[in-house]
Amino acid sequence: MTTEDPDSNHLSSETGIKLALDPNLITLALSSNPNSSLHSPTSDEPVPESAGKADTSIRLEGDELENKTKKDNDKNLKFLKNKDSLVSNPHEIYGSMPLEQLIPIILRQRGPGFKFVDLNEKELQNEIKQLGSDSSDGHNSEKKDTDGADENVQIGEDFMEVDYEDKDNPVDSRNETDHKTNENGETDDNIETVMTQEQFVKRRRDMLEHINLAMNESSLALEFVSLLLSSVKESTGMSSMSPFLRKVVKPSSLNSDKIPYVAPTKKEYIELDILNKGWKLQSLNESKDLLRASFNKLSSILQNEHDYWNKIMQSISNKDVIFKIRDRTSGQKLLAIKYGYEDSGSTYKHDRGIANIRNNIESQNLDLIPHSSSVFKGTDFVHSVKKFLRVRIFTKIESEDDYILSGESVMDRDSESEEAETKDIRKQIQLLKKIIFEKELMYQIKKECALLISYGVSIENENKVIIELPNEKFEIELLSLDDDSIVNHEQDLPKINDKRANLMLVMLRLLLVVIFKKTLRSRISSPHGLINLNVDDDILIIRPILGKVRFANYKLLLKKIIKDYVLDIVPGSSITETEVEREQPQENKNIDDENITKLNKEIRAFDKLLNIPRRELKINLPLTEHKSPNLSLMLESPNYCNALIHIKFSAGTEANAVSFDTTFSDFKEVEDFLHFIVAEYIQQKKV
């Protein structure tokens, strides 16, 4: 109860006069006037005990909150009518109030956003101390009296207005503190740990998981018992059986029998003991045999490994390139050796030049299997992979438009050497080097012959090239050892051009070596190296040989023309042939690299073969009384295949003497020009 004098200046308009009443001395009956504001069902603050036992939700919203409040107020009115005292002790109300009613009151007092899990005793004590330190001692005493009166007014049965949202009200703090007392009346002051929301949610989730797990296990046990019970009492088992189990499993499908235990006799004990010992002895014997077999197997593997590495150490030198590789067929890890010519200047990419090193247990030897043909085992690859180049010469029959075989290159083949090649790994490496060399030679020949089709060169298939000349035909073919032409013609008689075919094959191989050396020189001299070879300038294998043969035919034809149009007409004339030397390139000047100098020297050793042939045919004409005519012809092949004739003629040494200096590429024009010179200048002068 409060009183307020508006004319008094010393009274606070907010607090008024505070009275302290003993609730135990007041026994006035509560007025039952329905028009009283205390009995209004629309009161904003209901008595705390009206929280509703059935509703455990913390916050009510909208119409539900209003309906709930009205029902609680009606219950409180009925409760208060049975009371004789006007004011009740707050402790008697809140101390015995259940948590499901007390917690919503605390949440409404604390305001929105407050969580009950964050409330603890230490925080309440701090709030009480903070309120005590804000005011003076006198003011605190007055406030205590006022608070005591407020408690009686707020908690009393008259339902005076109470602000439950006042967070600074110490009465609420004391009520909350009183609620935390245990059954013995002692306050739990030892709780220092504050549980966060995340910890609470985690523990709640763990608890639910354990509960669900226990429920599942108990359900399974119940299902098992129900199914087992259905065989005895079907109705009882079906009543406790789940619908799913009742649908899936037929009732009475599970049964159980009680088997009586019969103690074994002494004799059975002895027999069982003997049987156990027998099984143990048999297991020990089998384990012994298994260990002995494993030991023998490991010993054999270890011995094979020792032999393998000893052979590797004896057969492989420091110059060989050894590395690890995985077999394509079996996936087994093996050692591989590089036998190709990539480091020597080879640009062949169709064969990597790698062979797997395998230990042949049967022959106790090491076998080299090319990585590109690793499907072959043992020594089968010698007959299936080994290839060689063969050159055959065919001579044209004059009476018939046909050719006859007049020469064939011979392959070095010795049965004893082949057997040694399969046993010695060094011989196998040499054999593989020959194979890849022959394959690259055929590859470069086909690449060059693609530009020589207009000169009678044709590519019949991927392993055969044919060069046709007026009177001869050359056939270059890559064959394997099991080819029919090799097997069926091993005992052929020697032919007239066999030596020539062998020399031609040697020349082809030497020209490939020259290409290797030129590639190495380009790699050393150029910072980027030579990646692709230029067919016109770098690949010179067929053209030098073809140029030599065609140049010899051109020279014979030119001599025949000179004989017919000059020598036979001009008596006393003769012809002199002179080879024109090519100027040496100045490649070694200002070169400090010894490797380049050495390569240039080795390449110049093949100049006799690689240089474009040039011949000077000088015709010696008879001298006249006043004139000394000179006639000379220069024959050369600028691109190894075509012929170019350079003719010079001078009628005398005088300044006004007639002279000619012209070049022809057609022999018919040469005939006409020689006939013109002889008829107009040589015979006329002679006459």
Curated annotation (Swiss-Prot):
UniProt entry keywords in alphabetical sequence: Activator, Nucleus, Transcription, Transcription regulation
Gene Ontology cellular-component annotations: core mediator complex; mediator complex; nucleus
Biological process, per Gene Ontology: cellular response to heat; positive regulation of transcription by RNA polymerase II; positive regulation of transcription elongation by RNA polymerase II; positive regulation of transcription initiation by RNA polymerase II; regulation of transcription by RNA polymerase II; RNA polymerase II preinitiation complex assembly; transcription initiation at RNA polymerase II promoter
Annotated signal sequence range: none
Molecular function (Gene Ontology), one example: RNA polymerase II complex recruiting activity
Cell wall biogenesis/degradation keyword on record: no
InterPro entries in the record: Mediator_Med17
Comp. bias (Low complexity): 30-43
Chain segments carrying region Disordered: 30-70, 130-189
Intracellular or extracellular location(s): Nucleus
UniProt biased composition (Basic and acidic residues): 56-70, 136-147, 167-183
Record's function text: Component of the Mediator complex, a coactivator involved in the regulated transcription of nearly all RNA polymerase II-dependent genes. Mediator functions as a bridge to convey information from gene-specific regulatory proteins to the basal RNA polymerase II transcription machinery. The Mediator complex, having a compact conformation in its free form, is recruited to promoters by direct interactions with regulatory proteins and serves for the assembly of a functional preinitiation complex with RNA polymerase II and the general transcription factors.
Family label: Belongs to the Mediator complex subunit 17 family.
The protein's assembly and partners: Component of the Mediator complex, which is composed of at least 21 subunits that form three structurally distinct submodules. The Mediator head module contains MED6, MED8, MED11, SRB4/MED17, SRB5/MED18, ROX3/MED19, SRB2/MED20 and SRB6/MED22, the middle module contains MED1, MED4, NUT1/MED5, MED7, CSE2/MED9, NUT2/MED10, SRB7/MED21 and SOH1/MED31, and the tail module contains MED2, PGD1/MED3, RGR1/MED14, GAL11/MED15 and SIN4/MED16. The head and the middle modules interact directly with RNA polymerase II, whereas the elongated tail module interacts with gene-specific regulatory proteins.
Further remarks about this protein from its record: Present with 1720 molecules/cell in log phase SD medium.
The protein's name in its UniProt record: Mediator of RNA polymerase II transcription subunit 17
Organism: Saccharomyces cerevisiae (strain ATCC 204508 / S288c) (Baker's yeast)
Taxonomic lineage from the root: Eukaryota, Fungi, Dikarya, Ascomycota, Saccharomycotina
Gene from which this protein is expressed: SRB4
